[in-house]
């Protein structure tokens, strides 16, 4: 084994703290097959004050160039009977928008997918969360209770269930992370996930500016006290741009109107773009350059919503056009997967967006894994049940809000719509598409 100490300081643009000091002890344990072809892998373990992480490295070596992984084989054998706070999922393709379950480990259902981070509260004030860091060119992992242990389950490649990862050497798995503390609040403050990611790849980050934005989809593009109809038009966007400027906000977000995106598409709505959807064709009622020019004159930056499919189909042309218009960033939606291909696509979005000075907000996406250190143009990820659901169901409540900081938010910045200005008691609550209640 090879032992070493890792110490570094770095800054985050989006994260739990601006200035981070990371200190850990590392051991690399080389492993080799005892029979031909004598393949070698390394088990790498790091210990921090606030947790432990391990990963598998597949070094470049003679006679072994690539691999196909059917199962990773990682398992966690917990002692005792902790209380578990987790989100059960029906399958690997998910928006991760569900309610958390609190149960004793002994009573927890077997053979059900558990989302990460999952929280384990032991007696005597010992708290542990299991998640992963630096998920890159790999499949996302879930937990699965079976035979008294928690098994790591990888998201399979599309169209089949057996193959999880295909890679050429050298390669490495994400870090499998156990966040540990005797104070539950310390889990929230932990920066272990960003500590385990590579340094920033963007040389000049001066253009990356998180801020507050309008959310016109939420209220249905209403334009109070006006004489025009709200929708996919310049007056509606001007109305909100003026509101942003007047109230000292930063961004105006453009989504579309009534399930019609701001770009040309022939599908059934925002989540189902048709085969002719074209991210480069703005609907005739909008002039994107005019909107961006007006916003710039008012000191307001523009943020676009888009479904990931038409955007990825023309990623290079679209990002170049966005930069030409003066767009600051995007909400990329309905990804709903974390198989190896989608993990690669997400990183490609971040890397190419950075070249065109665009920030990214992943919506309908898997959990963060600290990649906002490497690509600080990643602002937030959704993947949570939040108050946008008040438009169509009654699932959100105070208990869910309290679970969030100790589960999903442990992984990083979260796109969590929390509340609204029109509230009703639960016994009088009603779902409403425009001007919704909470």
Describe these PLM feature segments.
Residues 256-436:
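Aromatic- and carboxylate-enriched substrate-binding clefts and catalytic-loop regions
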Residues 33, 47-49, 80, 181, ...:
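Short, flexible loop/turn elements at secondary-structure junctions
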Residues 25-27, 52, 72-74, 173-175, ...:
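Structural beta-strand/beta-sheet cores of well-ordered domains, especially the beta-sheet scaffolds
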Residues 42, 163-166, 239-241, 291, ...:
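Generic recognition of flexible, low-complexity loop/linker segments
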Residues 165-247, 251, 255:
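An acidic-aromatic substrate-binding cleft motif
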Residues 1-201:
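N-terminal accessory beta-strand-rich subdomains and adjacent acidic, glycine-rich linkers
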Residues 73, 117-119, 241, 292, ...:
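Short amphipathic alpha-helical segments and helix-helix/interface helices
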């Amino acid at each position: 084994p090879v032992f070493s100490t890792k110490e570094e300081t770095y800054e985050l643009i989006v994260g739990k703290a601006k200035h981070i000091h990371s200190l850990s002890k590392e051991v690399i344990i080389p492993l080799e097959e005892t029979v031909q072809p004598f393949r070698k892998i390394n088990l790498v373990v790091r210990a921090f004050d606030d947790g432990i992480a391990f990963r598998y490295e597949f070094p470049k070596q003679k006679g072994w160039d690539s691999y196909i992984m059917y199962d990773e084989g990682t398992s966690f054998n917990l002692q005792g009977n902790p209380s578990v706070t987790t989100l059960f999922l029906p399958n690997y393709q998910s928006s991760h928008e569900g309610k958390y379950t609190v149960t004793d480990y002994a009573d927890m259902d077997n053979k059900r997918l558990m989302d990460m981070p999952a929280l384990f509260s032991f007696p005597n004030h010992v708290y542990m969360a299991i998640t992963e860091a630096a998920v890159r060119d790999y499949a996302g992992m879930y937990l699965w209770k079976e035979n008294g242990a928690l098994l790591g389950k990888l998201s399979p490649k599309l169209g089949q269930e057996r193959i999880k990862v295909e890679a050429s050497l050298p390669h490495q798995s994400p870090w499998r992370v156990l966040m540990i503390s005797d104070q539950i609040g310390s889990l929230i403050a932990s920066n272990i996930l960003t500590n385990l990611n590579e340094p920033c790849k963007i040389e000049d980050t001066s253009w990356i500016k998180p801020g507050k934005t309008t959310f016109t989809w939420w209220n249905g593009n209403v334009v109070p006290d006006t004489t025009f109809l709200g929708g996919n038009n310049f007056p509606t966007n001007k109305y909100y741009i003026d509101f942003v400027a007047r109230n000292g906000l930063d961004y105006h977000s453009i989504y579309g109107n009534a399930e019609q995106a701001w770009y040309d598409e022939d599908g059934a709505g925002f989540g189902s773009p048709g085969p002719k959807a074209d991210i480069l064709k703005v609907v005739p009622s909008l002039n994107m350059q005019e909107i961006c020019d007006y916003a710039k004159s008012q000191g307001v930056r523009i943020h676009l919503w888009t479904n990931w499919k038409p955007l990825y189909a023309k990623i290079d042309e679209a990002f170049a056009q966005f930069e030409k218009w003066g767009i600051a960033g995007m909400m990329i939606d309905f990804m709903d997967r974390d198989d190896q291909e989608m993990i690669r696509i997400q990183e490609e979005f971040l890397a190419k967006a950075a070249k065109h000075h665009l920030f990214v907000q992943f919506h309908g996406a898997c959990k963060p894994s600290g990649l906002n250190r490497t690509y600080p143009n990643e602002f937030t990820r959704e993947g949570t049940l939040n108050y946008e659901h008040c438009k169509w169901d009654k699932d959100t409540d105070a208990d869910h809000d309290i679970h969030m900081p100790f589960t999903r938010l442990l992984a990083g910045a979260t796109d969590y719509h929390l509340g609204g200005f029109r509230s009703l008691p639960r016994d009088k609550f009603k779902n409403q598409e425009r001007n919704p209640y909470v």
